[in-house]
């Protein structure tokens, strides 16, 4: 099967989340994401306003900010504060990390209550919840999937890219098999090539998170899968 690179890009959140990311890096990433019509540019909380400003200059591009990133174990109040600030700065999408430790400890009610609060705060915006699958058992992945679906989030996202592993075909297939109505899948972490990204889209993902697919040397062509 063939898939155009431009289609892959249209489903990709172009990320600039490395610890050394600067304001200039974010502005450049925003311009590139807009130029090639990515789904969004995904940036640290402190640079959301800069990305929004660059997006106004560059043209149509959505700005996504991350919260509770990358470990997920800040308090619910801290996540709410972080998200509220990003929405005020102009973010249209939020990628927030699940409290992985609470999930693994069986504190289901805590996780459920937090997710409901975050969904209420982001009503009218795109909310993606990062499950960080590399740390979860199969049963925990399915529990995360259910809780994220029940809260009304838009996406379950596989990984931050900062854990012990990234997106896998096995995890995406598992999520796709048990996916609740209305929930979509974002694969992220370790996706380095267009071929990898295309495979995840074929498996049923609606979004890809990647930092290395776009550059000024991009050339449109079809991908052989």
Where would I find each of the regions flagged by the language model?
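Conserved N-terminal beta1-alpha1 strand-loop-helix module at the mouth
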Residues: 1-88, 142-143, 147-150
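Hydrophobic faces of well-ordered beta-strands that scaffold small-molecule active sites
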Residues: 8-16, 39-43, 62-68, 94-96, ...
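Glycine-rich, proline-tolerant flexible connector loops at the mouths of alpha/beta enzymes
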Residues: 30, 34-50, 69, 94-112, ...
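Alpha-helix-loop-beta-strand connector modules within alpha/beta enzyme cores
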Residues: 45, 49-71, 106-133, 166-193, ...
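Catalytic cores of alpha/beta
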Residues: 52-53, 71-85, 136-147, 170-177, ...
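Glycine-rich phosphate-binding active-site loops on the catalytic face of alpha/beta enzymes
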Residues: 65-69, 88-103, 150-165, 189-225
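Conserved anion-binding
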Residues: 78, 83-84, 93-154
């Amino acid at each position: 099967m063939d898939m155009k690179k431009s289609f892959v890009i249209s489903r990709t959140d172009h990320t600039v989340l490395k610890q050394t990311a600067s304001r200039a890096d974010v502005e450049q990433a925003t311009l590139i994401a807009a130029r090639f019509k990515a789904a969004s540019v995904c940036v640290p909380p402190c640079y959301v306003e800069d990305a929004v400003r660059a997006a106004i200059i560059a043209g149509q591009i959505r700005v996504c900010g991350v919260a509770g990133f990358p470990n997920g174990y800040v308090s619910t109040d801290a996540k709410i504060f972080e998200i509220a600030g990003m929405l005020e700065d102009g973010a249209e999408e939020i990628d927030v990390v699940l409290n992985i430790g609470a999930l693994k400890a069986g504190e289901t009610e805590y996780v459920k209550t937090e997710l409901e609060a975050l969904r209420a705060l982001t009503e009218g915006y795109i909310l993606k919840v990062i499950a960080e699958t590399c740390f979860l058992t199969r049963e925990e992945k399915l529990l995360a999937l259910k809780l994220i679906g029940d809260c009304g989030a838009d996406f379950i996202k596989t990984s931050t890219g900062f854990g012990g592993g990234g997106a896998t075909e096995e995890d995406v297939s598992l999520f796709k098999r048990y996916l609740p109505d209305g929930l979509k899948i974002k694969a992220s972490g370790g996706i380095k090539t267009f071929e990898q990204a295309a495979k995840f889209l074929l498996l049923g993902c609606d979004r890809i998170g990647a930092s290395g697919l776009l550059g000024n040397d991009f050339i449109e062509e079809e991908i052989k899968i």
